[in-house]
From Swiss-Prot:
It is found in: Virion; Host cytoplasm; Host nucleus. Plays a role in the maturation of immature virions to infectious particles. May also participate in viral transcription. Its main location: virion. Belongs to the orthopoxvirus OPG146 family. One of its GO terms (cellular component) is host cell cytoplasm. This is Protein OPG146. The gene is OPG146. Residues 1-20 are annotated as: Disordered. InterPro entries: Poxvirus_A19. Interacts with capping enzyme RAP94/OPG109, the two large RNA polymerase subunits RPO147/OPG105 and RPO132/OPG151, the two early transcription factor subunits OPG185 and OPG133, one of the capping enzyme subunits OPG113, the nucleoside triphosphate phosphohydrolase OPG123, two core proteins OPG129 and OPG138, and a virion protein OPG064. Pfam families: DUF678.
Length: 77
């Protein structure tokens, strides 16, 4: 048996694509619904706040998808 006959019955494996994780300095939180980036408190002076939709209390609305964002401790109350 030569090597070509042995390979004919075997499934060929596809190589997984290499993924690289880019660790940005501007790591910021993302919206859990649409994954758009949210403003960090340290960047508050650099960003125009006209697009932030405040709802009631500590709840914000994501300007990209409209979902409501609130603190985790607000879920208990």
């Amino acid at each position: 048996m030569d090597s070509t006959n042995m390979r004919s019955g075997m499934k060929s494996r596809k190589k997984k694509p290499k993924t690289t994780v880019i660790d940005d300095d501007d790591d910021c939180m993302t919206c859990s619904a649409c994954q758009s980036k949210l403003v960090k408190i340290s960047d508050i002076t650099k960003v125009s706040l006209d697009y932030i939709n405040t709802m009631r209390g500590n709840t914000l609305a994501c300007s990209a998808c409209g979902s409501s964002l609130k603190l985790l401790n607000d879920f208990a109350s």
